[in-house]
């Protein structure tokens, strides 16, 4: 089955079609998904009737508003039901694998709490703003000590980024980068190049992609930057922690974790 890591909406040219595809896959039992912060943003705008937001958010709202009235009402109702029913994170393969949009700490795994939900969907920031006007993110992955392999996204990187037993597979597809999936339990990364740049961000990823790896910092170390260098999908990072040894789960069907 496919497992979607969130941020299915915003900035892309066919948000409604993409959302319908994922909702159908999940309802038919062919996929699982966790919510991203962009799903929450769009849902909030639809509920409040807001006409203000980022350029990417309003692009999505316009696509939804362009639907015929009956189709628009049906889509909004289905989207609301879908997003609100999603778990903030997934624990799979008897605890060997975890999936969360922005990551997860060991103490939140398998537990339902407001703090854990907020972390899984939005991550954690230092409270500081970088020179691009974006929040400086806490590098939670560097301190992760859990047994489960955590697959996440949220912060675009130039290439899949392994840090200990975590891997970030958000490789900036919407910014002209790649759409990346991790085949599990094979531990094989598969990437497909974006057809074009769909959205222009404020800064660029390594290798000339539209968005650079977001500035991150450990608590008390503001400004620490962790950036992945461009490399072949599945290659061992050229700097930073080595790729971890693949977990050896009980035999099961293949799971693909993907994100746009």
PLM feature segments, named:
Residues 79-111:
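Hydrophobic, aromatic-enriched interface-forming segments
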Residues 116-230, 234-238, 243, 254-260:
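Acidic, His/Gly-rich catalytic cores of divalent-metal-dependent hydrolytic chemistry
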Residues 7, 36-37, 60, 83, ...:
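Divalent metal-coordination and catalytic microenvironments
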Residues 44-48, 109-113, 204:
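Short aromatic-enriched loop/helix-cap "lid" or pocket-rim segments at secondary-structure transitions
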Residues 2-4, 33-34, 98, 151, ...:
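Residue-level marker for buried hydrophobic side chains located in beta-strands
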Residues 11-91, 119-121, 125-132:
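Active-site neighborhood of divalent metal-dependent phosphoester bond hydrolases
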Residues 10, 39-40, 104, 157, ...:
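Short, glycine/acidic-enriched loop or turn micro-motifs at the edges of active sites
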Residues 1-14:
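An N-terminal domain-cap segment
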């Amino acid at each position: 089955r496919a497992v979607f890591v969130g941020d299915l909406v915003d900035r892309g040219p066919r948000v409604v079609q993409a959302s319908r595809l994922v909702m159908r896959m999940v309802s038919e039992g062919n996929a699982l998904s966790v919510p991203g912060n962009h799903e929450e943003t769009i849902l909030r705008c639809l509920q409040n009737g807001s006409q203000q937001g980022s350029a990417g958010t309003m692009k999505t709202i316009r696509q939804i508003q362009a639907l015929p009235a009956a189709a628009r009402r049906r889509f909004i109702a289905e989207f609301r039901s879908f997003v609100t029913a999603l778990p903030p994170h997934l624990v799979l393969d008897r605890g060997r694998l975890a999936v969360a949009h922005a990551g997860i700490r060991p103490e939140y795994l398998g537990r339902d709490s407001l703090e854990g939900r907020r972390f899984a969907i939005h991550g954690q920031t230092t409270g500081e703003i970088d020179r691009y006007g974006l929040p400086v993110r806490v590098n939670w992955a560097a301190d992760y000590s859990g047994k489960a392999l955590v697959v996440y996204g949220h912060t675009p990187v130039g290439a899949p980024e392994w840090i200990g037993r975590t891997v970030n597979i958000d490789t900036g597809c919407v910014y002209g980068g790649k759409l990346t999936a991790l085949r599990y339990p094979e531990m094989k990364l598969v990437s497909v190049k974006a057809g074009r740049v769909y959205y222009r961000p404020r800064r660029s990823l390594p290798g000339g992609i539209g968005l650079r790896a977001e500035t991150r910092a450990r608590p008390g170390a503001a400004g620490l930057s962790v950036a992945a260098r461009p490399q072949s999908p599945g290659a061992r990072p050229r700097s930073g922690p080595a790729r971890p040894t693949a977990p050896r789960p009980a035999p099961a069907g293949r799971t693909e974790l993907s994100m746009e």
